[in-house]
UniProtKB/Swiss-Prot annotation:
It comes from the Bacteria. SUPFAM superfamilies: XseB-like. InterPro entries: Exonuc_VII_S (IPR003761), Exonuc_VII_ssu_sf (IPR037004). Bidirectionally degrades single-stranded DNA into large acid-insoluble oligonucleotides, which are then degraded further into small acid-soluble oligonucleotides. One of its GO terms (cellular component) is exodeoxyribonuclease VII complex. It comes from Pelotomaculum thermopropionicum (strain DSM 13744 / JCM 10971 / SI). This is Exodeoxyribonuclease 7 small subunit. GO terms for molecular function: exodeoxyribonuclease VII activity. PANTHER family: EXODEOXYRIBONUCLEASE 7 SMALL SUBUNIT (PTHR34137:SF1). It holds the Pfam family Exonuc_VII_S. The gene is xseB. Keywords: Cytoplasm, Exonuclease, Hydrolase, Nuclease. HAMAP family: Exonuc_7_S (MF_00337). Heterooligomer composed of large and small subunits.
């Protein structure tokens, strides 16, 4: 039976957990290699989702002549909150 494809958030959460385990440094070599391989797979899943999102954004921001209108995005709401906290 084929494994269900993870959504972006699931893959990212698992990737973060794998990285945390690997950074701990207490794993036997074989387990570390297995987790590293899993992490590579998870990073590829995340990358596919991000590339797909980038393509969708390019389509949505295309002008009437088919050219892409590049718009600079401001900081995310979370980034703005972090900036305000430093003041």
């Amino acid at each position: 039976m084929a494994e269900k494809e993870m959504n972006f958030e699931e893959a990212l959460a698992r990737l973060e957990a794998v990285v945390k385990e690997l950074e701990d440094g207490r794993l036997p070599l074989q387990k570390a290699l297995e987790l590293f391989a899993e992490g590579i797979g998870l990073s590829r899943i995340c990358n596919r989702y991000l590339e797909d999102a980038e393509q969708r954004i390019a389509i949505l921001t295309a002008d009437e002549k088919g050219g892409v209108v590049l718009r600079e995005l401001g900081p995310s709401p979370a980034a703005r909150e972090d900036t305000n906290d430093e003041l």
